[in-house]
Amino acid sequence: MIQQESRLKIADNTGAKEILTIRVLGGSGRRYAGLGDVIVATVKDAIPGGNVKKGEVVKAVIVRTKKETRRPDGSYIKFDENAAVILNSNGEPRGTRIFGPVGRELRDKKFMKIISLAPEVI
């Protein structure tokens, strides 16, 4: 359950380490975001020489949440951390590698490039 001011770790190699959520996309009054949802965020921590800089406003898709997500078969999935992958203007990942597992819900939301780069899809 990601909302405004939520901080997320970054699960790719763009150079950002942490982002802070500015807005959840998908409706004017939308409050929460879950797996596969797109957010607008600002980079709070980044490594020197990376593709993104601290203070940059980016779009990102959520790939892991601590809050459990219910699946259509009745099972639940949750992760140890909240994490996201930074997107470019076309909705594709800006990085070339994804670290850690990602939720299967990304396949339903048509983020196939992230699914193919991820080491594990749960």
Curated annotation (Swiss-Prot):
GO molecular function, a single term: large ribosomal subunit rRNA binding
Annotated GO biological process: translation
Keyword list, A-Z: Ribonucleoprotein, Ribosomal protein, RNA-binding, rRNA-binding
GO CC, one annotated term: cytosolic large ribosomal subunit
InterPro entries: Ribosomal_uL14 (IPR000218), Ribosomal_uL14_bac-type (IPR005745), Ribosomal_uL14_CS (IPR019972), Ribosomal_uL14_sf (IPR036853)
Subunit annotation: Part of the 50S ribosomal subunit. Forms a cluster with proteins L3 and L19. In the 70S ribosome, L14 and L19 interact and together make contacts with the 16S rRNA in bridges B5 and B8.
Record-given protein name: Large ribosomal subunit protein uL14
Originating organism: Clavibacter michiganensis subsp. michiganensis (strain NCPPB 382)
